[in-house]
């Protein structure tokens, strides 16, 4: 770790710190890519990991004899050195392991200590599902926060952010650390309080939008570290309107999804603009779009959600717009407007990309299967979809700030991540984020059995086959989880199961308020659960009594995802 980052970590308690954005050319990226593997071999990081964990094991007898107050004092004395990966790290790991055992009743495995050391070093850890990532993140957060560093634990949804913050709170409290969580719907004051805690659990989307709000509050020119430090000296801390304390240390769960799959997704902060009074314009755009012919007037690439007018389509559109004024008078205006209308009609589908409720169109996050409250599509697309669905038109939004996950997470002074599926994107993660991936061996060998893929002729046959397979597993005493890719698909399968008189529960964007209850029961013997991506990454399903003996949880996937991960 560079001297600059060490210095920044020392200042972390007082200033809104973040790493300056890097501007790299192709040659810079090539040099880093070519030298990354060599650097990793020279550092012999894996040997150091094994030595740290072995030394932590050797400390167990001494540490277990310590009183609670002695544990606390020992960690605070060792934390700063542990953050720098100094000789204090093994003792610090042993201290937190003992505290977790005393306060949570969970004694971290060697594999979890190994992963915690990987994260503390600012690397990507590939840790298999079921190995205890939640506790691992908490161990790392304890070590970093004990040195005064503001820690963000980034999870994939609100449910996990709140659950893990509350579940790990006794461990943090043992060391005098405070914890907060950020979920959708919190007020600015609630967010400010949560970010002021030693450790903050939050989702990637909530975190980035709060950062953008701070950027808008600071102003277009931003604020230098010296300016923010001056505010601190004057008693203003971060300033009255700022939410975060800076971007010091992040632990990103399911990091490949956030850092790679969603890397270039633009996150746009906007404010309400003028009300929409001319609904007839949107209806006319939809009417004209419906008269255009696929293939001859426009071409669609559904997999990439792309659509463009052909030369013939532009001519047809000009003919259909003849005699109309306003936006229809110019070729550029009418072509952009009708292209958006075509996207609304053919690329965005109800119960797949959005949900209609209470006279509003709610966007469904394609990665998590959850509703994104208050989010809208831009450039008139949202209003066109509202018009298509017969909803009242919302106001135009004016863009205030935007950023991608890739640009945002590169601004952390120290970034780390965990996932069970990092191997195939390890080179890209190293190139873009300078994160070297380390595979953490499982505590016990996996007992998962992968069955062959079955292909059916049509949807109806597929749903019947799913019902039959679920019935077979249920008869054996196993709980069954059926994964679907969309809200619509989950409800189609639910209808088939109901016709077959098979009791089941459905977890999708309509039933998101019942998530905790559904997940808690999904591992019980004889339970059948149909779920969208909401029960995907980061979801822990605990097996009920007798389930392991019956074969464990039986998972049925009904569609392949875009990525094998």
Features from the language model and the residues they span:
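Conserved P-loop NTPase motor core
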Residues: 1-565
């Amino acid at each position: 770790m560079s001297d600059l980052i060490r210095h920044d970590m020392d200042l972390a308690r007082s200033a809104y710190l973040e790493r300056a954005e890097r501007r790299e050319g192709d040659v810079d990226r090539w040099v880093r890519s070519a030298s990354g593997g060599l650097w990793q071999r020279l550092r012999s990081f894996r040997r150091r990991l094994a030595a740290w964990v072995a030394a932590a094991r050797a400390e167990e007898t001494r540490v277990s004899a310590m009183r609670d107050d002695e544990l606390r004092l020992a960690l605070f004395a060792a934390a700063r050195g542990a953050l720098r990966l100094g000789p204090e790290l093994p003792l610090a790991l042993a201290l937190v392991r003992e505290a977790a055992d005393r306060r949570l009743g969970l004694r971290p495995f060697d594999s979890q200590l190994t992963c915690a050391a990987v994260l503390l070093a600012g690397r990507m850890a590939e840790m298999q599902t079921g190995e205890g990532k939640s506790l691992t993140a908490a161990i790392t957060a304890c070590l970093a926060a004990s040195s005064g560093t503001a820690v963000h634990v980034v999870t994939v949804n609100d449910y996990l952010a709140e659950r893990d913050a509350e579940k790990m709170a006794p461990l943090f409290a043992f060391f005098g650390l405070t914890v907060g969580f950020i979920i959708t719907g919190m007020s600015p004051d609630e967010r400010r309080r949560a970010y002021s805690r030693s450790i903050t659990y939050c989702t990637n989307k909530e975190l980035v939008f709060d950062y953008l709000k701070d950027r808008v509050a600071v102003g277009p020119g931003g604020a230098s570290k010296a300016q923010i430090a001056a505010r601190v000296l004057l008693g203003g801390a971060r300033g009255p309107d700022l939410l975060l304390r800076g971007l010091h240390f992040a632990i990103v769960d399911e990091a490949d999804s956030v850092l790679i799959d969603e890397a270039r997704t633009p996150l746009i902060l906007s404010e309400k603009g003028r009300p929409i009074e001319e609904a007839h314009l949107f209806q006319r755009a939809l009417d004209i779009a419906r008269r255009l012919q696929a293939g001859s007037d426009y071409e669609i690439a559904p997999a990439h959600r792309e659509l463009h007018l052909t030369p013939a389509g532009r001519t047809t559109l000009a003919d259909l717009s003849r005699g109309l004024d306003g936006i229809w008078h110019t070729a550029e205006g009418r072509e952009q407007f009708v292209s958006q209308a075509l996207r609304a009609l053919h690329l965005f589908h109800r119960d797949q990309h959005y949900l209609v409720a209470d006279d509003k169109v709610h966007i469904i996050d394609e990665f998590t299967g959850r509703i994104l409250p208050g989010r809208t599509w831009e450039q008139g697309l949202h209003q066109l979809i509202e018009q298509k669905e017969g909803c009242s038109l919302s106001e135009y939004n004016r863009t205030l700030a935007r950023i991608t996950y890739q640009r945002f997470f590169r601004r952390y002074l120290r970034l780390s991540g965990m996932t069970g599926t990092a191997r195939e994107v390890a080179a890209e993660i190293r190139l873009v984020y300078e994160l070297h991936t380390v595979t953490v061996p499982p505590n016990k060998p996996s007992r998962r059995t992968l069955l062959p893929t079955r292909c059916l002729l049509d949807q109806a046959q597929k749903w019947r086959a799913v019902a039959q397979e679920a019935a077979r597993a249920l008869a054996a005493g196993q709980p069954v989880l059926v994964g679907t890719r969309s809200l619509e698909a989950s409800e189609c399968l639910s209808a088939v199961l109901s016709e077959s008189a098979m009791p089941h529960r459905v977890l999708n964007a309509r039933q998101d308020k019942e998530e905790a209850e559904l997940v808690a029961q999904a591992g019980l013997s004889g339970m059948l659960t149909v779920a969208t991506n909401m029960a995907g990454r980061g979801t822990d399903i605990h097996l009920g009594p007798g389930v392991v003996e019956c074969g464990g949880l039986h998972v049925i996937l009904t569609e392949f995802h875009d990525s094998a991960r």
